């Protein structure tokens, strides 16, 4: 009842061939975008809550958003980046803030 199939040499892959086929996942930047209405304290809260930054780093990133128009909050695989964007945007809307989180290919 077992599968008695044997592998021919043409069907097997060498370790080098397997490494060539494996590609690291595409990575994406999660970006917070500036607006004229979201309080700075709310941006800091988002950075701590969803990206686990301490108060000092969250404040630095908030100031980058404020003065440069946007800041990269982290670099993640597609699935994680998409989840972070949805979570942050949902949280902003629930708190009646126009803060916008987006993703872009790293």
Swiss-Prot record:
Polar residues composition-biased segments: 1-16
Residue span of region Disordered: 1-21
GO BP field: protein catabolic process; proteolysis
Transmembrane domains' residue ranges: none
Protein family membership: Belongs to the ClpS family.
Classification via NCBIfam families: PRK00033.1-3, PRK00033.1-5
Function description: Involved in the modulation of the specificity of the ClpAP-mediated ATP-dependent protein degradation.
Quaternary context: Binds to the N-terminal domain of the chaperone ClpA.
Name recorded for this polypeptide: ATP-dependent Clp protease adapter protein ClpS
Species of provenance: Pectobacterium atrosepticum (strain SCRI 1043 / ATCC BAA-672)
Organism taxonomic ancestry: Bacteria, Pseudomonadati, Pseudomonadota, Gammaproteobacteria, Enterobacterales
């Amino acid at each position: 009842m077992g599968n008695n199939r044997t592998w021919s040499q043409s069907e097997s892959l060498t370790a080098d061939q397997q490494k060539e086929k494996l590609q690291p996942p595409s990575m994406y930047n999660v970006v917070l975008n500036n607006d004229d209405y979201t309080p700075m304290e709310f941006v800091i809260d988002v950075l701590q809550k969803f990206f686990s930054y301490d108060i000092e780093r969250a404040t630095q990133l908030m100031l980058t958003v404020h003065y440069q128009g946007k800041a990269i909050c982290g670099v993640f695989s597609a699935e994680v980046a998409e989840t972070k964007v949805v979570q942050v945007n949902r949280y902003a809307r629930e708190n009646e803030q126009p803060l916008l989180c987006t993703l872009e290919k790293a």
